[in-house]
């Protein structure tokens, strides 16, 4: 082997690219020393990350197991088959495709399989907690299809199933989408099934945010009620960043397989699929149910404590991992609140709230989630303290003494609940 190739292949990251290595160390330090409350984020296990960083990244494997267009796929076939079988077992599904690169890719594949440009779809308004891929005008789903958006009730801030039914009867959509990115309440998938049947629509559940809760049995499953279910594999499922499609009908399964490849993707990411398999295996363990129950309990405690401190919570609470603050109650925008909590090492995101008068770049809300810190071991009492830190910072934005105290409390919490207990905090250079 030449010196050049030996150096290129065998050098570790720190010596091969010290700049990237340093930035990764800094990001790990940030994760260790900040409170992660972004609802769509979580911390993958060492095992998941090791699978994703394996030699599988070298392998091309277009097609499905035992139906590849490349040789040398015997081991990735076994890995992908294991991922499929674990996904089916985890969600009690008849079929699964583990190849989508993301939740958005999974949704696009479903659209390709079931719809034609110009067809009518129904999805929750983005400002009410929906997702870009459910028909937002800035997304391809909003450009290719005729989109009818439903919303939440202005008083309860919950889904009004009768209003949704009337809208569906009026517009006769070909596809109804349920499952959201900022909706903190339990979704009645059976009621959506009834509406879809009444108007002759396909029913898609995008359970990206609640997949882990569904897998653990702490949120009702959409699989028995929906024609197709999509999800990401991170968030509450705590796997690698990727997508997944599930269904219970063999005829649909063939369409979805073709819609993924060759319809919307080329070669699958087998290193990510291996990491998905590991995550599915973790989620099949009894400890994952305990974890998911704690996620929901922690969210309830976070919401209750923030309400007690005079901060409004959309819908008055939560049934899942999401706590959505309506900051109009304290005369603050989401943009300002995001900056204030970030300044004391709490990571969240500004978010629209139902009937928000502000633009999506400003917003009136702050979205919080409990999945990541629950992975670190945070319990109900710890989350009550997190709520107090947030409330102190938002109620006293100009008080530097309170800011310093918030920083100290965050630091103590991070020390009490280390992220990766077997890893040493990297030295920063």
Swiss-Prot record:
GO cellular component: cytosol
EC number: 2.1.2.1
Gene: glyA
Pathway(s) served: One-carbon metabolism; tetrahydrofolate interconversion; Amino-acid biosynthesis; glycine biosynthesis; glycine from L-serine: step 1/1
Catalysed reactions, semicolon-separated: (6R)-5,10-methylene-5,6,7,8-tetrahydrofolate + glycine + H2O = (6S)-5,6,7,8-tetrahydrofolate + L-serine
General function of this protein: Catalyzes the reversible interconversion of serine and glycine with tetrahydrofolate (THF) serving as the one-carbon carrier. This reaction serves as the major source of one-carbon groups required for the biosynthesis of purines, thymidylate, methionine, and other important biomolecules. Also exhibits THF-independent aldolase activity toward beta-hydroxyamino acids, producing glycine and aldehydes, via a retro-aldol mechanism.
UniProtKB keywords: Amino-acid biosynthesis, Cytoplasm, One-carbon metabolism, Pyridoxal phosphate, Transferase
Family: Belongs to the SHMT family.
Cofactors demanded by this protein: pyridoxal 5'-phosphate
Binding site for (6S)-5,6,7,8-tetrahydrofolate: 126, 130-132, 359-361
Coiled coil location: none
InterPro entries: PyrdxlP-dep_Trfase (IPR015424), PyrdxlP-dep_Trfase_major (IPR015421), PyrdxlP-dep_Trfase_small (IPR015422), Ser_HO-MeTrfase (IPR001085), Ser_HO-MeTrfase-like (IPR049943), Ser_HO-MeTrfase_PLP_BS (IPR019798), SHMT-like_dom (IPR039429)
Modified residues (N6-(pyridoxal phosphate)lysine): 235
Class of enzymatic activity (EC top level): transferase
Protein name: Serine hydroxymethyltransferase
GO molecular function: glycine hydroxymethyltransferase activity; pyridoxal phosphate binding
Compartments it resides in: Cytoplasm
UniProt source species: Synechococcus sp. (strain CC9902)
